[in-house]
Curated annotation (Swiss-Prot):
This is tRNA pseudouridine synthase B. It comes from the Bacteria. It catalyses: uridine(55) in tRNA = pseudouridine(55) in tRNA. Disulfide bonds: none annotated. PANTHER family: PSEUDOURIDYLATE SYNTHASE TRUB1 (PTHR13767:SF2), TRNA-PSEUDOURIDINE SYNTHASE (PTHR13767). Coiled coil: none annotated. The gene is truB. Its EC number is 5.4.99.25. NCBIfam families: TruB. The active site is at D37 (nucleophile). Pfam families: TruB_N. InterPro entries: PsdUridine_synth_cat_dom_sf (IPR020103), PsdUridine_synth_N (IPR002501), tRNA_psdUridine_synth_TruB (IPR014780). It comes from Thermus thermophilus (strain ATCC 27634 / DSM 579 / HB8).
Amino acid sequence: MALYAVDKPLHLTSHDVVEEARRRLSTRRVGHTGTLDPLATGLLLLVTNESTKLVPFLSGEDKEYIAWVSFGATTPTLDAEGPISEEAPARFDRKDLEAALPRFLEVREQVPPLYSAIKVGGKRAYEAAREGKPLALGPRPVRYLEVELLAFDPEPIPHPIAPSARGWRLAERRGRPVRLPRPLGAYPTAVVRLVVGPGTYVRAFARDLGEMLGTKAFLSGLVRTRVGRVGLERAVALSDLSPEKAIPELDVLPFPVVELSHTEARRVLEGMPLPIPAMGYVTLVDSKRRLLAIAEGDGFKLKIRRVFAKEA
């Protein structure tokens, strides 16, 4: 089993990355744990072959982003694809911005962008929007876990970024370079660090932040810096992707690890429950720390949810 962390280049779709990974890794069985828009860069976690079975256990992971939000205008797609569709005065200062951001920690619902992959009645929202017949999208549950202002600039500036004990942030000296889309204008721009739950659209966050501040806003740049336990510092350039760059699955899975005896391992491979008093999901390994299965506990026993090994 193999997983790979790739730094998605600007302008490529997530599918473009998957296609290139298939070529470089010599396998058709390649997927990812969560898409990135073409105008976003950063961490795309790829799964291959047997590790594709891990996707249901990884797609709910929290994600960290650094977002560039430009104020005073908006676009149909809510990002820098353009064109500018509406402008509005941005009459607020840094203190107003700092006061608005913590309010997102109480937000529990979000209306997705009209240009999104959500399906309604078998039709993708972005397809309907491009046809001039936008769908009525209702609010969906979201979670904002951390929202932090990193900078407030007179225009989008591609600050370098670096990891820290408190998440990724702007680098004081040398850091990882950032590529932003072509600016749509010299609009005042906030750089915001976000940690969010699954299903959260950062483009919609930009729209909603603008509304909180009495203006229009759009996402002028985005870098994904973490997916669950994997940070952007572990990502390789797509041009450097090779089988040797794999990440061990135990570094990625978010569940407690339970090491089994040989007898217990045999029971797992037969799909039999184990009398181990654990709660929630756990990762089961053998004495050599090889992944055997993922199980779910009810406090009395473990029920096997997915077996990966063929022998113990």
